[in-house]
């Protein structure tokens, strides 16, 4: 089998590349996905309100686990990643947050990455998006990804929480992806107008999969990339339960889009990475790149949960006797409780003036429950998910064997810097202050978690050690740049090799301020133009907010 391009991973970026490259009818593409199809009849992945279900099983989730995290009381922590057409866009929380403009301007400070500034990237965010309330300088109107924004009147808790943030002195913003990210406001979400999850499989692959020049193989577990000297010339994979490898040749390039956990794994198994690690497993060295699998970053978050004094939370939706009606309303009408992920409000703040742009993110949820659906509080409640955005902690991903089915060693080194502890203490105390504003007086009951007895630095730190969880945003393990730990250049091309790119969240040099999916899709769009030799979209001229030393919040 021969193709112009072989794409490994049909996820948030891989599906973008498959769709854009096959727009040229003379270009042939093989798309390999280790998981299965995104079954449209499976409510677990298609119903926004069911977002916790895929994280509870292994059909759509790699369900990785970290090594014992040394600063988190040696907990082994969850590291869910999407498996199936759509990748993590098939199982994520559907929050469409691009990050802060200054995140990208910060990337562009690195020599060789100058064209990754916010204004260079904004046209690609817009190209990918169709927003339900119409296009403008910041939002697209005819892209493959359906984005809906929260409307007033969904649940009184959302407006009360935004109002409470303002009463605490923080700004309101009507668009967390627009001129000003900083502040509290409605959340954009990747949901279709018919109340279905808008994964990249639905948005991109649906328009491309019938093209004769695109071949899609599911249940295809990539073993390694085949090299001829320093040139990537093909891929070898295992299909289904078979132990006999299948091969295909790439006439032009191999495009690795397997995500921040699997992409470095595949490079290491293919002989690209730290020479000492590869020698441990008798893997012939193709090219030494010590940065492969290093620079691992994530967002850590925790929940502050409160009893709700009025019966306006989603607690009744968790009762089994209400779920058939909710399911029917969603299935036949695309409406009701099932048609939302219920992260309809959130915000970004600076906890201290020394941060040039927001370092704390909020997601508001009108029910008290863990992200993966466990430990639901058996009463009306609500919660804030809160976490720091740009932790200095760094971890790694390293293979444990040559077997592609064996999970790698993953260590995030969560909370390994004093800055981490300071940010989380600040975040808990600020959140409590917001929760005690007048706007929430009629709703706020007792604090369920952490509980009012948890007050000192030592008590807060212990709560974080025991209860903080991943926000499922790993990135950075094949970072873009030109220093000695960089893996790819500014076009995703692997240093020192030919015919091989990495295009996914692993190439982010530094994690962004917000959820990763929108930016991963943007990366796919931007590098697709580079691969095709197309001129980059014209740089945007839109303005954007820079705090520039402004006070963190208005004085009361």
UniProtKB/Swiss-Prot annotation:
Its cofactor is FAD. It is an enzyme of class 1 (oxidoreductase). GO terms for molecular function: betaine-aldehyde dehydrogenase (NAD+) activity; choline dehydrogenase activity; flavin adenine dinucleotide binding. The keyword Metal-binding does not apply. GO terms for biological process: glycine betaine biosynthetic process from choline. Pathway: Amine and polyamine biosynthesis; betaine biosynthesis via choline pathway; betaine aldehyde from choline (cytochrome c reductase route): step 1/1. SUPFAM superfamilies: FAD-linked reductases, C-terminal domain (SSF54373), FAD/NAD(P)-binding domain (SSF51905). InterPro entries: BetA, FAD/NAD-bd_sf, GMC_OxRdtase, GMC_OxRdtase_N, GMC_OxRtase_C. The keyword NAD applies. Coiled coil: none annotated. Belongs to the GMC oxidoreductase family. This is Oxygen-dependent choline dehydrogenase.
């Amino acid at each position: 089998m021969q193709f112009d391009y072989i794409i490994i991973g049909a996820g948030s970026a891989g599906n973008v590349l498959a769709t854009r490259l096959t727009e040229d009818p003379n270009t042939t593409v093989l798309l390999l996905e280790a998981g299965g199809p995104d079954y449209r009849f499976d409510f677990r992945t298609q119903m926004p309100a069911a977002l916790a279900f895929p994280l509870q099983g292994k059909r759509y989730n790699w369900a990785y686990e970290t090594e014992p995290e040394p600063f988190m009381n040696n907990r082994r922590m969850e590291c869910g990643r999407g498996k199936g057409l759509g990748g993590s866009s098939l199982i994520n929380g559907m929050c469409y947050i691009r990050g802060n403009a200054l995140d990208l301007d910060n990337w562009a400070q690195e020599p060789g990455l100058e064209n990754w500034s916010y204004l260079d990237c904004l046209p690609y965010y817009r190209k990918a998006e169709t927003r339900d309330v119409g296009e403008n300088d910041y939002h697209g109107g005819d892209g493959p990804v359906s984005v809906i924004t929260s409307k007033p009147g969904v649940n009184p808790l959302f407006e009360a929480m935004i109002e409470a943030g303002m009463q605490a002195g923080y700004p309101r913003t009507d668009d967390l992806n627009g001129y000003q990210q900083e502040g509290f406001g409605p959340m954009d979400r990747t949901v279709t107008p018919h109340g279905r999850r808008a994964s990249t499989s639905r948005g991109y692959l649906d328009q491309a999969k019938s093209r004769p020049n695109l071949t899609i193989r599911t249940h295809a577990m990539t073993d390694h990339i085949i090299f001829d000297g320093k040139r990537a010339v093909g891929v070898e994979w295992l299909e289904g339960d078979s132990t006999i490898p299948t091969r295909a040749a790439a006439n032009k390039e191999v495009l690795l889009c397997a995500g921040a956990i699997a992409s470095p794994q595949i490079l290491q198994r293919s002989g690209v990475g730290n020479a000492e690690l590869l020698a441990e497993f008798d893997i012939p060295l193709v090219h030494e790149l010590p940065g492969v699998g290093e620079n691992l970053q994530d967002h850590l978050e925790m929940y502050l949960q409160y009893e709700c004094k009025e019966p306006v939370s989603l607690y009744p939706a968790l009762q089994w006797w209400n779920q058939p009606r909710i399911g029917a309303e969603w299935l036949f009408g695309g409406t009701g409780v099932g048609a939302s992920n219920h992260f309809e409000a959130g915000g970004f703040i600076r906890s201290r003036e020394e941060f040039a742009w927001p370092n704390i993110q909020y997601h508001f949820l009108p029910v008290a429950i863990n992200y993966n659906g466990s430990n639901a509080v058996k009463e009306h409640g609500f919660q804030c998910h809160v976490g720091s955005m740009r932790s200095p902690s760094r971890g790694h991903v390293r293979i444990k064997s040559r077997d592609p089915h064996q999970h790698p060693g993953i260590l995030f080194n969560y909370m390994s810097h004093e800055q981490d502890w300071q940010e989380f203490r600040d975040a808990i105390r600020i959140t409590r202050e917001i929760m005690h504003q007048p706007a929430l007086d009629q709703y706020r009951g007792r604090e369920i978690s952490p509980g009012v007895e948890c007050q000192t630095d030592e008590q807060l730190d212990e709560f974080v050690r025991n209860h903080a969880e991943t926000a499922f945003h790993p990135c950075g393990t094949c970072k873009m740049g030109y220093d000695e730990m960089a893996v790819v250049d500014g076009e995703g091309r692997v240093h020192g090799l030919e015919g091989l790119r990495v295009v996914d969240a692993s190439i982010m040099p530094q994690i962004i301020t917000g959820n990763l999916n929108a930016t991963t899709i943007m990366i796919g769009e931007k590098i697709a133009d580079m691969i095709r030799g197309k001129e980059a979209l014209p740089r945007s001229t839109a303005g954007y907010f820079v705090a520039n030393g402004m006070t963190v919040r208005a004085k009361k």
